[in-house]
């Protein structure tokens, strides 16, 4: 047979010793086991020197001149049989690059010799593994589907997905075109283009993919590990070496430093080692403090709620802090459906438990899991109270919106003790609200805050009168709903008792207590009035705290040292002054002038004198 290329090179195969080239028998090759061959793609340049004829010409010496032709092969194909041992065919396949997998096929899509000029190109399939597909029959190409290919190779092609055909690096095995063009030739081209990409994907699928390790983000507050003595020496000498050799690379500098370190004396090395030991001790101390701080921090968990109730106010990211007061063994988690009380760390430690539907429409509810060291003592003294924290920015920035959409839903069976705390100062400043600093308590409760009142519950209302402001209290059965109304012009509230007045100040909420036997303005019972801080907007339900100590009647008028302005712009604390306060450290940014400071101090002093005097009522103009 003649190969294209101009030289008459013939390769003959004769004799019965090669039954695998017989058309009547099945093609068997030695099994290579389960080994996988990873043969990289070999792209051929368009060079005539790499033609098949030149490659096959090297095998001319291996031909058997005395052998006779195989009758069965000649009868079917009308050509001399080819003597291509399997090893040679494999080598030819690797050089030709037609098929790159050890267990696939090799095609020679040229017209081989003049005897084949009238026939379609002969394709010889030489399987290299245990594939049982025989030779092609009567000029037809033997095709291998994906399932058969995967079963023979012992690999999976990704669940039967058909891979897209990829363009092979070479379009043809040789630059000499075939004189015949047919559908078989197109099929050979498509099949050969698919094989390199399929084999590559198969090999990759066989390997185990390692899951990428996720690196934890470093905390900037975490102390840094100390460096070694050599690293300290490297830092000291690197700048000097760079100054002498500006063009030196990092590797060259490292070599110079290493040689200098080796030649360094033991005493000089000990200096750097002592520095390292000291740095290690400092690092261990800082690391222990850092870990303790991490353990003490509250773990905040966000629980998604069912979006059943509509929300009128969008919920900003939750923020809440609880100040550490004294260690107490407890853990606080909010009830699933009681979402609103503001817990803050600016005033004394209060414990609170209030249910409100105002924040129920928000998509998030914040759970605080607080360690023993962070719990204030007043929390453990509560009667099983649970604290739900809502974002502080909702209270400050939304103003009365939260209060108007909220109603108290505490059941009578619940033992509810409601104590309020001031809102975070940072959130109040961000919301441009007036952050009023409370003066130290001088036997008067903190200022009162405005809240809307539902008409269904009994209330204690503070009515405003021209000079004094007296508290008119109605007799509720057991619990008192306090609704505090404040008029736009801030007024001074004074305490005016009739015979005697018993004022009690406690460390937790400041209260004004009275006797249950002597009513306050026709009130048959006495109640504990807990006043909110100026920045807190919430409704309170307080338990009745009777006290049988004072035998005489009395009228109680609450004294407010700093009335709260509802406008977002802060005003002077003095009663009746509408001017904005001036920034001053001495006044705590609460007064507009020295005159207002003097007048306000006089008013507070006169109110205190009035509370001491049991027989006279002092009115301050």
Curated annotation (Swiss-Prot):
The modification Phosphoserine is found at residues 178, 181-182, 315, 533, 550, 552, 560, 562, 567. The keyword Phosphoprotein applies. Keywords: Chromosome, DNA-binding, Methylation, Nucleus, Phosphoprotein, Transcription, Transcription regulation. It is found in: Nucleus; Chromosome. GO terms for molecular function: chromatin DNA binding. In liver, recruited to target gene promoters following treatment with dexamethasone and cAMP. Binding is decreased in presence of insulin. Residues 307-319 have a biased composition (Pro residues). A motif (Nuclear localization signal) lies at residues 213-218. InterPro entries: HMG_box_dom (IPR009071), HMG_box_dom_sf (IPR036910), TOX_HMG-box_domain (IPR051365). Its main location: nucleus. The modification Asymmetric dimethylarginine is found at residue 481. One of its GO terms (cellular component) is chromosome, telomeric region. Residues 223-291 bind DNA. GO terms for biological process: positive regulation of transcription elongation by RNA polymerase II; RNA polymerase II promoter clearance. The modification Phosphothreonine is found at residues 176, 313. The keyword Transcription regulation applies. It holds the Pfam family HMG_box. Residues 208-218 have a biased composition (Basic residues). Residues 320-333 have a biased composition (Low complexity). Component of the PNUTS-PP1 phosphatase complex, composed of PPP1R10/PNUTS, TOX4, WDR82 and PPP1CA or PPP1CB or PPP1CC. Interacts with PPP1R10/PNUTS. Interacts with FOXO1 and CREB1 (increased by cAMP); FOXO1 and CREB1 are required for full induction of TOX4-dependent activity and the interactions are inhibited by insulin. This is TOX high mobility group box family member 4. It comes from Pongo abelii (Sumatran orangutan).
């Amino acid at each position: 047979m003649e190969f294209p290329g101009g030289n008459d090179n013939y390769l003959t195969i004769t004799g019965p010793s090669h039954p695998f080239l017989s058309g009547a028998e099945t093609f068997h090759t030695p099994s290579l086991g389960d080994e996988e061959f990873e043969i990289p793609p070999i792209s051929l340049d368009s060079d005539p020197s790499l033609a098949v004829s030149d490659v096959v010409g090297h095998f001319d010496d291996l031909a058997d001149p005395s052998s006779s032709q195989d009758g069965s092969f000649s009868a079917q194909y009308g050509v001399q049989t080819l003597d291509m041992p399997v090893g040679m065919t494999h080598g030819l396949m690797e050089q030709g690059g037609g098929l790159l997998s050890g267990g696939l096929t090799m095609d020679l899509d040229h017209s081989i010799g003049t005897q084949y000029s009238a026939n379609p190109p002969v394709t010889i399939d030489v399987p290299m593994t245990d594939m049982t597909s025989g030779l092609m029959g009567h000029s037809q190409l033997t095709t291998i589907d994906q399932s058969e290919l995967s079963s023979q190779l012992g690999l999976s092609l990704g669940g039967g997905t058909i891979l897209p055909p990829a363009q092979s690096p070479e379009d043809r095995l040789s630059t000499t075109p075939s004189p015949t063009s047919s559908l078989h030739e197109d099929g050979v081209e498509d099949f050969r283009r698919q094989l390199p990409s399929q084999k590559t994907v198969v090999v990759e699928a066989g390997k185990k993919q390692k899951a990428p390790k996720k690196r934890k983000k470093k905390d900037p507050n975490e102390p840094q590990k100390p460096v070694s003595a050599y690293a300290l020496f490297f830092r000291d000498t690197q700048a000097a070496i760079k100054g002498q050799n500006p063009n030196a690379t990092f590797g060259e500098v490292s070599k110079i430093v290493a040689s200098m370190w080796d030649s360094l004396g033991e005493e000089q090395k000990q200096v750097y080692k002592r520095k390292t030991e000291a740095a290690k001790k400092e690092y261990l101390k800082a690391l222990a403090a850092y870990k303790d701080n991490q353990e003490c921090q509250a773990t905040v968990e966000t629980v998604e709620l069912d979006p059943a109730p509509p929300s009128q106010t969008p919920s900003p990211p939750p923020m809440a802090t609880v100040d550490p007061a004294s260690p107490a063994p407890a853990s606080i988690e909010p009830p699933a459906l009681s979402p609103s009380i503001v817990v803050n760390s600016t005033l004394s430690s209060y414990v609170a438990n209030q249910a409100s539907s105002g924040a129920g429409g928000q998509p998030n509810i914040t759970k605080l899991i607080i360690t023993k060291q962070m719990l204030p003592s007043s929390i453990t003294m509560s009667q099983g109270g649970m604290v739900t924290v809502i974002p502080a920015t909702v209270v400050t920035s939304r103003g009365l919106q939260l209060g108007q959409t909220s109603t108290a839903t505490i059941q009578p069976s619940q033992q509810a003790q409601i104590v309020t705390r001031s809102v975070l100062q940072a959130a109040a400043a961000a919301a441009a609200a007036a952050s009023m600093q409370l003066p130290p308590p001088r036997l008067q409760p903190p200022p009162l805050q405005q809240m809307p009142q539902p008409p269904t519950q009994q209330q204690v209302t503070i009515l405003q009168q021209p000079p004094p402001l007296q508290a008119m209290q109605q007799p509720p059965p057991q619990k008192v709903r306090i609704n505090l109304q404040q008029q736009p012009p801030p007024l001074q509230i004074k305490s005016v008792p009739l015979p005697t007045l018993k004022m009690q100040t406690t460390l937790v909420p400041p209260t004004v207590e009275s006797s249950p036997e002597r009513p306050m303005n026709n009130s048959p019972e006495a109640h504990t009035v807990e006043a909110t801080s100026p920045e807190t907007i919430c409704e309170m339900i307080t338990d009745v705290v009777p006290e049988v100590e004072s035998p005489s009647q009395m009228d109680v008028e609450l004294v407010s040292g700093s009335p709260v302005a509802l406008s977002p712009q802060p005003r002077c604390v003095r009663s009746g002054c509408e001017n904005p306060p001036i920034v001053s450290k001495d006044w705590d940014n609460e007064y507009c002038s020295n005159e207002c400071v003097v007048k306000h101090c006089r008013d507070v002093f006169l109110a205190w004198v009035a509370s001491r005097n049991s027989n006279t009522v002092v009115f301050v103009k």
